Regions:
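Interhelical loop/hinge segments that connect adjacent transmembrane helices in multipass membrane
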Residues: 1-4, 8, 117, 143, ...
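Membrane-proximal transmembrane or re-entrant/amphipathic helices at the cytosolic face
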Residues: 2, 408, 427-467
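Transmembrane helical elements of multi-pass membrane transporters/channels
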Residues: 11-26, 152, 174-189, 193, ...
Length: 467
């Protein structure tokens, strides 16, 4: 089991660098965004981004998730896997471009042609970047991803400062800077990972069929996941206005801190889950990883809730400061999302994408219904609560369905108690209505309940330092 921990720890270290550096740079940009963009402009940019994320699974057949799974499978030629993904992306981009052209001829009020151009560019660079990063993981080129992620963030930071602060191009400058960063990253992956070697003229039809059979059910899963994470922006815009939607979008920046921790571990874990899957979990590797992941997420979540208002005072300026009120439930939703994804990686390992889709769709339905009801009464805060409930349902359902493939050795009573403690902490934030040291009780309580996991993490970290 030592080698399993070593391999996972190495990847966690690499993904930490590729995730934390860009996130730090992105936080530098938040004051620039909130000073140079209006809430309405930020709302428009957010809607463009979320619309791209909605269309991606349909026009790419969500092939990106098949890329890593099949690149790690020795039964398939890596060149076939890469070429299949590339062809599907190019066909999808052609269709999106055609749709954008049709939209421009309809002269829809408020829909500028410049937005459509950026929309197509955002779609193409996102689709290509997603598949390239997944393929690099599959061929064990994680180090290339690290540098690529940092390079993308540095370009975005520099371009945003130039376009927003110096040239004062507003929303156009923001969109141009983000697109430029993504394009540079794509070129980097191609050059450093020598991906051109994996492009072939002839592709096995069996590879195409197997990849599409694997990824097709995920279209519904990813779409439902999008509903969980992004539909609230549209409903909020419709029911409360674009300015409130922009405020809500900014609120996601603080939960983004927790999302980095989730993303780092998940990126590394998704590789290990496929390589090390054992239905009996004889050495307890998967159970140990689950417990440590769960501890890390709930502990960091609790700490960020404590520091929510001080962080908001630093990051949010002017009218954006009110966004701090929506942060706590969004933080808890990140925890549920993280654990649902952890379990989802096991379903990916056994190639059961149908179960992933069913759980996510049910969660999305509940989320949507709650959005309409809660936003009506509580506006943006209602949207945050609905998101938390949606992810919570997916998490619980996947836990139940997982028993079909593996038996994890967990302390259910402890996990349930800690989740309830997070909810109590969330409620207490609004009762106190200001920063209070009483909030420190909650992270300390979590540490006490997860002492075993704290010791294991310390031992692993100590071993890494010695090496």
């Amino acid at each position: 089991m030592a080698n399993k921990h070593k391999y996972l720890a190495k990847n966690v270290g690499l993904f930490s660098i590729s995730s934390f550096v860009p996130k730090i740079l992105s936080f530098v940009l938040i004051p620039i965004y909130t000073n140079c963009l209006t809430t309405a402009e930020y709302g428009v940019s957010d809607l463009l981004t979320t619309t791209v994320s909605l269309l991606l699974p349909f026009f790419t057949l969500d092939i990106q998730d098949a890329v890593m799974r099949f690149a790690l499978d020795k039964k398939y030629e890596k060149s076939d896997v890469f070429t299949v993904a590339l062809r599907i992306i190019l066909i999808g981009t052609g269709l999106v471009t055609l749709g954008a052209f049709v939209a421009s001829t309809l002269k829809i009020p408020g829909l500028e042609n410049s937005y459509l151009i950026f929309f197509v560019l955002m779609y193409f660079t996102t689709a290509l970047s997603n598949s390239l990063t997944m393929f690099c993981r599959g061929i064990d080129k994680v180090n290339v991803l690290v540098v690529g992620g940092i390079l993308q963030s540095v370009i975005m930071l520099s371009a945003n400062i130039l376009f927003l602060v110096v040239f004062k191009w507003g929303l156009t400058g923001y969109l141009l800077a983000n697109t430029l960063g993504s394009l540079v990253a794509v070129f980097w992956y191609f050059i450093r990972a020598k991906l051109h070697k994996y492009i072939t003229k002839a592709v096995s039809k069996n590879v195409l069929k197997d990849m599409v059979r694997f990824s097709f059910p995920l279209i519904f899963s990813v779409t439902a996941w999008w509903i969980n994470s992004a539909s609230d922006r549209y409903i909020l815009t419709w029911m409360s206005g674009i300015a409130v939607s922009g405020l809500y979008a900014v609120a996601y920046k603080i939960p983004g801190i927790l999302s980095v921790f989730q993303s780092v571990f998940y990126q590394a874990w998704s590789i290990s889950a496929i390589k090390e899957f054992d239905k009996d979990d004889k050495d307890g590797f998967i159970s140990n990883m689950y417990n440590m992941m769960n501890f890390g997420m709930v502990f960091v979540c609790s700490v960020i809730i404590v520091l929510n208002i001080p962080i908001a005072k630093i990051l949010y300026t002017n009218e954006f400061f009110e966004a701090y009120k929506f942060v706590p439930p969004l933080l808890v939703s990140v925890v549920f999302n993280a654990m649902a994804l952890f379990i989802g990686s096991i379903f990916t390992a056994v190639k059961d994408t149908k179960t992933l889709s069913v759980s996510t769709i049910i969660g999305a339905v509940i989320n949507t219904v709650c959005n309409f009801v809660f936003i009506y009464y509580w506006q943006a805060y209602g949207a945050a609560i609905a998101t938390m409930l949606g992810y919570g349902v997916v998490f619980v359902m996947r836990h139940i369905m997982l028993r079909k493939y593996i038996k994890l050795h967990l302390k259910w009573w402890r996990d349930i108690f800690v989740y309830l403690a997070l909810i109590v902490q969330l409620v207490s934030v609004y009762s106190l209505e200001k920063f209070s040291l009483l909030q420190l009780v909650f992270p300390v309580l979590i540490l006490v309940f997860y002492l075993k996991e704290v010791k294991q993490i310390f031992i692993q970290f100590k071993g890494l330092v010695k090496r």
